[in-house]
From Swiss-Prot:
<feature type="region of interest" description="Disordered">
    <location>
        <begin position="306"/>
        <end position="331"/>
    </location>
</feature>
<keyword id="KW-0966">Cell projection</keyword>
<protein>
    <recommendedName>
        <fullName>Centrosomal protein of 131 kDa</fullName>
    </recommendedName>
</protein>
<dbReference type="GO" id="GO:0005929">
    <property type="term" value="C:cilium"/>
</dbReference>
<feature type="compositionally biased region" description="Low complexity">
    <location>
        <begin position="446"/>
        <end position="458"/>
    </location>
</feature>
<dbReference type="GO" id="GO:0090317">
    <property type="term" value="P:negative regulation of intracellular protein transport"/>
</dbReference>
<dbReference type="GO" id="GO:0001669">
    <property type="term" value="C:acrosomal vesicle"/>
</dbReference>
<keyword id="KW-0970">Cilium biogenesis/degradation</keyword>
<feature type="coiled-coil region">
    <location>
        <begin position="580"/>
        <end position="1111"/>
    </location>
</feature>
<feature type="compositionally biased region" description="Polar residues">
    <location>
        <begin position="79"/>
        <end position="97"/>
    </location>
</feature>
<keyword id="KW-0158">Chromosome</keyword>
<keyword id="KW-0206">Cytoskeleton</keyword>
<dbReference type="GO" id="GO:0035721">
    <property type="term" value="P:intraciliary retrograde transport"/>
</dbReference>
<keyword id="KW-0968">Cytoplasmic vesicle</keyword>
<dbReference type="GO" id="GO:0070121">
    <property type="term" value="P:Kupffer's vesicle development"/>
</dbReference>
<keyword id="KW-0137">Centromere</keyword>
<feature type="compositionally biased region" description="Basic and acidic residues">
    <location>
        <begin position="307"/>
        <end position="331"/>
    </location>
</feature>
């Protein structure tokens, strides 16, 4: 802004200058009593009102009425003060009716000045202003600095410069109003971009009247004042006019009295120019601030929309992951249920086989017992011919006992066959009940036939004992009944002194308990005790036999001495035979116990190997399942990551399209505004062109008239002041004048400093606010990015922890199942002795079949994986080609540099995150493969089926994705063709505009406008050419980036293919090593089995030899 100085700076020193300052500055002076007058002092208040106008191009109307008529001058002055505030002072209420005389009345005795002051003081007392064309008042608030006046610069061309003068009534009000109106109209046209309608001339004549221009300008100024503009205090400068002047005495006006001087036109124009310049600066700054605010709001809205989309995408991804987890859980449950049903069916089949085997073994044992029993019957018949008892009774008794025992054994076998999976306790209870029932039946029979049993001979008892020793004892299922019921028949049959067939059968049944490792010595000791007790009983019976024969059997024939000697010799030989038989029996028991121990060890070894094989198979299945799930999870994660990248690309392309559309809209808008401004500029030039000369003429005329009037007025006033001034008032007046000068200077300096400080503060505040908003936006953006990274990291760690927890839970559950299975197998181990041969044969057959099947499946899996690898490579190539095309089409649309930099940053971040994830996944896969190298041997069958199904599904998905990508490619090509058509249309439109501009340049007659238009067209052409060059550079850069990305992707594909080939080779090698290990274990088992069979055959041959030797003796 221009520098300001006080209008009183050029006042000459002296009393005249002081008097002029007193009459022009509008200061309130409260005068006391005159020294030589009896009238009281009057209060006096004057106001200076400056109208707001713009002097960009000096404007005024023709001087129509410059006469001296007071009514017309007052009316013009009222019109000129249409936008001026008339402020009433706060101390007017203190003025009384006695102080109503104007202070100028001391110097001017005519009624002219009083009449003019009265006409000015008749204005509204409620601080109102009037419009130009109507008399409706408008209320304005009173500013705090109502007494302050704005200083104005004086032109440098003027030699003589007077003090500041008040606005007189004869100042050409129309000229000032017209200039202000035209200046404001030009300002509104040139600098107000909010108005869209250009000014159009009237239909009567091509130039609008000044009154209409003044009215429009005043309305605009009023709206600016109501909206709180900063120029309000600069446009309205007024002092309060006391209402006490209405009661001042009036004297008749002398026609020859001179009028007061006016404010010069140059000062008013400079002041108007300063005010309008300040208003233009403030409006421009406000528009820039509003535009930046709107741009920031749009950026924030876009960021919020993108964040909302990202949240929705995350929610959808979470839903998809949950559905996939549910599906995987359902599949796991179905697989577990199938495995459980398969195990149950296998157990049932095994139990049925064992029951059949036990029945067959039982039948074979019965047949052997029957076969051994018949020779005993024949020998007994031959040897008991000399006994007095009848053989029919003995035969009947033996048959009865045999029938009972056989029936009991049949019951036991039936129970075993019916419930093979029952508990050992239930079997032991059934066997105990059968034994107790058989014992009770034997007791009844023994009570009935005790007399017949006592008459048996020693030879018959010896033969029964030999037959019992020759028979192989059968084992019971429970050893608990051993201590309770095994030797109960000895205690219960205290009356019988010899072994009967019933006792022998009962002893055979009770001695069928299995030989325990810790109870073998007890079993042999019990048998030895039973044999020794039997021999003692035989000796007692031999000693008691002669007495019983001689006394009790009167029907027998008395033996001779020779027969007695023979009998004694036979008894001695029998004692020797029994001793040797006891020794042999003990040795046989020891051998049998060793054979049983070896058989149990062999069975346990076989069961252990079978169990190990099953456990390894389960573990391999489990590890294969885990590997499959992990691979599927990683593949799914990579697919989701790729989908996310595609979605990000789509979002970025949409944003680019939106930005392009906005740029087009802004371009169209500004082209319209440029056209409107050109039309307005033409209209202004049409309006103001012929007025410039008139304004210059009016300026010259005004300056001449003003000089003459000012000189006359100064001379008259100096004369009046010299004549009327009282010497006693001069010192007081001088003091007041100096005091008011100082106050005015201070107020002006303070006001200027406050205005400058306010402008600086406002500018600094808004700059600071914009910087703070920009910094806050950057900070929020960085915080949001960091927060998103932290959330992604936490989500990844949480997912990893969940997967590890699930893996640990599955591992614990499987360990628990394995332990339960081991316990169950240990419980069922006692029932699996009869299945060793079948299991061996089945194991050999299954191992051979499994080896062949594994070889075939390995060949198939290798072929299938090679085929799948080729298909995947082909699909990846097609997908990469499609993505390359879509990427090129998307990146051709990007025109702004900040979008490109942002996209590169996002690409780098995403690439780093993807590389980190890929590295982590590769490391995790390597660790998992290293851990699972020794556990993937028997997983080929189910694996190939599932892999085949999975890859068929993947092929379907790939075909579907290929179709969708082809559709997207077609759509993008259509969009590209549309954009090319749009570009052609815009080029044609540009050519049309250039043609129109050239036509307009030919039509227009003014060289200045034609040059401006040509320069504008050249600027537009240059801008368009620069934009085309930028687009070409952008396209080249995009092509380079696409080629680099293609090369990187090709390298990555090659690396992935190499890794897959290495993994396949490693899997193939591991499978081969697993098969070789399996074959080695099978060969070792086969050799061990053959050695065990040979040992068993050898032991059986030894037992057979010993049995033959015993029978031969």
């Amino acid at each position: 802004m221009h520098t300001t100085r006080s209008p009183s700076a050029s006042i000459q020193a002296g009393a005249a200058g002081d008097a002029l300052d007193l009459s022009l500055n509008g200061s309130q002076l409260t005068m006391g009593r005159r020294p030589s007058s009896a009238s009281p002092g009057k209060h006096f208040s004057r106001s200076i009102s400056v109208s707001v106008a713009y002097d960009g191009r000096g404007k005024r109307n023709t001087l129509t009425d410059a006469g001296l008529g007071s009514s017309r001058a007052i009316k013009n002055l009222r019109r000129s003060n249409s936008t001026t505030q008339v402020n009433q002072q706060a101390n007017t209420s203190l003025s009384s009716e006695g102080h109503t005389e104007d202070f100028l009345a001391l110097f001017n005795s005519s009624s002219d000045g009083r009449r003019k002051l009265a006409s000015l003081s008749k204005m509204s007392k409620d601080r109102t202003t009037w419009n130009i064309l109507d008399d409706q008042p408008r209320v304005f608030p009173v500013p705090s600095s109502s007494h302050s006046t704005c200083s104005m610069d004086s032109p440098t061309g003027l030699k003589k410069r007077e003090a500041g003068v008040s606005l007189a009534a004869n100042f050409t009000a129309n000229n000032r109003s017209n200039k202000a109106a035209v200046g404001n109209a030009v300002t509104a046209i040139l600098h107000n971009n909010h108005s869209e309608k250009p000014l159009t001339p009237k239909s009567s004549n091509q130039k609008p009247s000044f009154n209409n221009l003044i009215k429009a300008t005043v309305n605009d100024d009023v709206t600016l004042d109501v909206s709180g503009s900063l120029t309000k205090s600069q446009k309205n400068f007024s002092s309060a006019s006391s209402s006490s002047n209405n009661n001042a005495p009036r004297s008749p006006r002398s026609p020859g009295q001179p009028r007061r001087r006016e404010v010069t036109e140059e000062e008013a124009e400079r002041y108007i120019q300063q005010v309008n310049h300040a208003a233009i600066i403030i409006q421009r700054w406000y528009r820039r601030h509003v535009n930046s605010k709107r741009a920031n709001e749009n950026i924030i809205k876009q960021l919020l929309a993108s964040k909302k989309k990202e949240r929705e995408q995350r929610a959808e991804e979470a839903k998809t992951t949950e559905s996939l987890k549910k599906k995987e859980d359902d599949r796991k449950r179905i697989r577990e249920e199938k495995a459980r049903l398969a195990r149950l069916t296998a157990i049932q089949e095994l139990q049925q086989k064992r029951a059949q085997r036990a029945a067959e073994v039982q039948q074979i044992a019965e047949q052997e017992t029957e076969a051994l029993r018949h020779p005993g019957k024949v020998g007994r018949k031959k040897l008991t011919k000399s006994s007095p008892t009848s053989p029919t009774d003995i035969k009947a008794k033996n048959t009865d006992s045999n029938v009972n025992v056989v029936s009991d054994l049949d019951d036991v076998t039936n129970l075993r066959a019916a419930s093979p999976a029952g508990s050992a306790c239930r079997v032991s209870q059934c066997s105990q009940e059968i034994l107790q029932r058989s014992v009770s039946m034997e007791d009844q029979r023994q009570g009935a036939s005790s007399s017949r049993a006592q008459s048996k001979t020693t030879l018959n008892d010896l033969l029964d004992t030999l037959k019992l020793l020759e028979e192989e004892p059968e084992r019971l299922s429970e050893p608990k009944s051993y201590r309770k019921d095994k030797y109960s028949w000895i205690d219960e049959d205290g009356d019988s002194n010899s072994l009967t067939t019933d006792n022998v059968e009962r002893h055979r049944q009770l001695s069928q308990t299995p030989a325990l490792p810790d109870g073998g010595a007890l079993l042999s000791e019990a048998k030895l005790q039973s044999i020794m007790s039997f021999l003692d009983e035989m000796e007692k019976s031999e000693q008691e036999r002669p007495r019983s024969v001689t006394s009790g059997s009167h029907r027998e024939v008395v033996l001779s001495e020779e027969d007695l000697a023979v009998v004694e010799q036979a008894s001695a030989t029998a004692a020797e035979v029994t001793g040797s038989m006891m020794r042999l029996r003990l040795e046989l028991d020891e051998k049998k116990r060793t054979v049983n121990m070896l058989q149990t060890a062999l069975a346990q070894q076989r069961e252990l190997t079978i169990r190990h094989v099953k456990e390894t198979e389960k573990e391999l299945n489990h590890t294969f399942q885990l590997q499959k799930e992990q691979y599927e999870a990683t593949i799914q994660r990579h697919l989701t990551f790729i989908d996310q990248l595609i979605d990000d690309k789509k979002a970025l392309s949409e944003r680019c399209e939106e930005v392009v559309g906005e740029l087009k809209q802004v371009d169209q808008k500004y082209t319209k505004k440029i056209a409107q401004m050109q039309e307005q500029h033409e209209l202004v030039w049409q309006i103001l062109g012929p007025m410039c000369e008139e304004i210059k003429k009016l300026k010259e005329l005004m300056s001449a008239t003003e000089k003459v009037r000012r000189e006359k007025w100064i001379n008259e006033k100096t004369k009046k002041i010299k004549e009327i001034t009282v010497k006693g008032l001069e010192p007081e007046i001088q003091k007041l004048i100096s005091k008011h000068k100082q106050e005015l200077k201070k107020l002006r300096v303070l006001h200027e400093a406050e205005l400058l400080q306010a402008d600086e503060r406002a500018a600094q505040r808004y700059v600071r606010q914009s910087e703070e908003l920009r910094q806050q936006l950057e900070k929020e953006k960085d915080e949001q990015c960091q927060r998103e990274r932290e959330l992604a990291k936490q989500r990844f760690e949480k997912q990893l922890q969940e997967e590890e927890n699930v893996l640990q839970q599955q591992r614990r559950r499987l360990y628990k199942e394995v332990s339960e299975e081991k316990e169950r197998l240990t419980q069922l181990a006692a029932r699996q002795h009869a299945e060793l041969e079948d299991l061996r044969k089945q194991l050999e057959d299954n191992s051979s079949l499994a080896g062949r099947a594994l070889r075939e499946e390995l060949e198939k899996s290798r072929d299938e994986q090679e085929r799948r690898h080729q298909v995947e490579i082909k699909a990846l190539k097609e997908r990469l080609e499609i993505e390359k095309q879509t990427w090129e089409e998307n990146y051709m649309k990007k025109e702004e540099a900040w979008l490109l930099s942002r996209e590169r940053e996002l690409k780098e971040e995403v690439r780093r995150g993807r590389d980190k994830e890929i590295e982590l996944a590769i490391q995790r896969l390597e660790v998992e493969t290293r851990e699972a190298r020794e556990e993937c041997e028997r997983a080929a069958d189910n694996r190939m089926k599932r892999v085949r199904e999975k890859y068929e599904a993947e092929l379907r998905d790939l075909e579907r994705s290929e179709r969708t990508s082809l559709q997207k490619q077609q759509e993008m090509r259509e969009k590209h063709s549309e954009m090319e058509a749009e570009l052609l249309r815009l080029q044609s439109l540009l050519r049309q505009r250039e043609q129109e501009i050239s036509d307009l340049t030919q039509v227009t007659a003014r060289d200045k406008l034609s040059e401006e238009r040509r320069s504008l067209s050249e600027v537009i052409r240059q801008e368009f050419a620069e934009r085309l060059i930028e687009l070409e550079e952008e396209n080249r850069r995009m092509k380079m980036e696409v080629s680099e990305a293609k090369a990187r992707l090709r390298l990555e594909v090659e690396r992935v293919t190499r890794e897959k080939e290495e993994e396949l080779a490693e899997v193939h090698q591991r499978v081969k090593s697993a098969i070789l290990k399996k074959e080695e274990t099978v060969n070792n088992l086969r050799k061990q089995h053959e050695a065990a069979v040979k040992r068993a055959d050898h032991l059986e041959s030894l037992l057979e030899q010993q049995r033959k030797q015993l029978l031969g003796k």
